[in-house]
Amino acid sequence: MSADPSSSTSRTVAVIGAGPVGCLAAMAFAKRGWRVEIYEGRADLRLPESRANLALRSINLAISHRGIVALQAVNSAAADRFLADAIPMHGRMVHTTAGKEETIYYDRDHQHINSIDRAVLNQGLLDELFFRHKVQNIDFDGKKMTARDLETGRDVEAHFDLCIGADGSYSVVRRQMMRVMRMDFQQTYMKDEYMELRMPSGVGASGESTFLLHPNRLHIWPRHSFMLIALPNKDKTFTCTLFAPSTEFDKLDTVDKFLSWFEHHFPDAHRHIGADALAKDYSRNPRCPLICTTSNPYHYKDRAIILGDAAHAMVPFYGQGLNCGLEDVRVLSALLQAEGITSDKTSEDPTIVDPRLAHALAYYSEHRHEDLVAICDLAQNNYVEMRHDVTSPMFLFKKAVDNVLYMLSRRQRLSLASFGSALASVPFPAGEPSEWIPLYTMVTFRPDVSYATAQRKARRQARVLTVLGWLTASAVGAGSLLALVASYDRARRLLTR
């Protein structure tokens, strides 16, 4: 991936972690002329056995506008390839215990998120890596590190100008940074866990493979304290994920108990998956923890920075973990460009700090932190919406009102294509849209609106909805949509006094 591996005048970036975030970071720096080396402790993720192991505990990835724009900013051709392998999902399909299905669209314009297999995304980004090399120690001040070749057991030393930690929730790079700097860090395990299940494809009238559920929906079986979700795959199967409190899983300590419980709560999913397949998945697939981590700052001098889950692991209920991590890369790359940071070495002496690069990394830490805290909070809150609120008439009513106000106040529809070029060189979009925009639309389909801005705006809009509900109930009992819309300006004036 290096522009010129033999050149001694180009800076070297060592990327630790070969997941989507690490690989996109490597591509971004290679594009800017840096020498790139990627270190990954796992075996080659493109091998069949690696993909099989990944499938046992890997939630399918939902990539939306933020992630796509980040990919486009680095390599538009790669973004097009990934989208060709993705399946669009235009909304949630809610499954009741009575077998009824109802679609709740994400957006009044039927904009969609995309389901993509994690292995497919990784495979498309991987190129030149040191697989089976586990980082043992990092000397940031000396700009060198030791990695163990797990095949031979030998330690190898590598030198770098910048180290990027994209090595996940249990980041080695983050732990090494905490030895030499003051970093605030918090790790929280959720009371819930998850287990992967798989729904097979069906057989059509002519013997062809078919989807057993609507292929362009994210399927949800909300059951208040737990839920099942299913995302479509290109081979006509569905990757299902069961989320439940640890105490609920503890009760299901035999296959028979699990099958009986599953059939009672998810009868249609039980029918589609089948008892034998469910029993196999229950026995083979692990119960996995849900973890949330926060840290600050994200950098050390001019020589280290953490991105993605290494900096901010979040629960998967907003579908923004991948998108946020990829956006980290876009923001950092655009910031380095804006600061005029090039691939040219500034000194051969590792003790000398490059003030411009140090300032750029510090600026990233300071200005990215608010957004990362916001999306972690939003993701956690969205779990309640997915497993409980989507069954509530009040939720559906508020969503309808949200969309009406969005329609009435919107000035123009912004397409995905319009964001790519606009954000490629803008690390932190400024300002706040003046029109009414639902929270989900801002987070998922408006990469020009920061997470923190979306959260602040949504809180104000929620207060407006509360006042509208009160005014409508007072005026017309159950209320009519026209009366509610007519109350909009009055409610907004009340809130801004």
Language model features: what each stretch is:
Residues 2-13, 58, 64-196, 255:
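Conserved N-terminal helical subregion
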Residues 21, 44, 170:
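Conserved Rossmann-like nucleotide-cofactor binding loop
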Residues 30-55:
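Glycine-rich FAD pyrophosphate-binding loop
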Residues 38-39, 165-166, 307:
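Generic enzyme active-site microenvironment
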